[in-house]
């Protein structure tokens, strides 16, 4: 039988906006043999169910914390266009509608949690497929 795990991340300030509803939806609609691995930061959410496993992303990924600390003051790594000495560079030809403008789409620090969560899941969860939601 093919096995599947679902993973997701969310910041603490998005719990009420969408994360809680997403986890409740998983519990209600997904098959019992599909576990959701919810990578969180800060305080672990209090929604408890056998189909949900919480993972503190900063605890299991010290490299994520180092990356965020290293790039937190780098405008380009945070989706802006102003470059600083020793910082990340963005190809001026990159992008289409946001070429030469700041955009959340280029925010490597904000979205780094997702990359580190996928990496951790692929290395530690013993299933055939890992699905990102």
Where on the chain are the PLM-derived regions?
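N-terminal anchoring/stem segment of glycosyltransferases
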Residues: 1-102, 109, 113, 123-126
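GT-A fold catalytic core of metal-dependent nucleotide-sugar glycosyltransferases
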Residues: 115-133
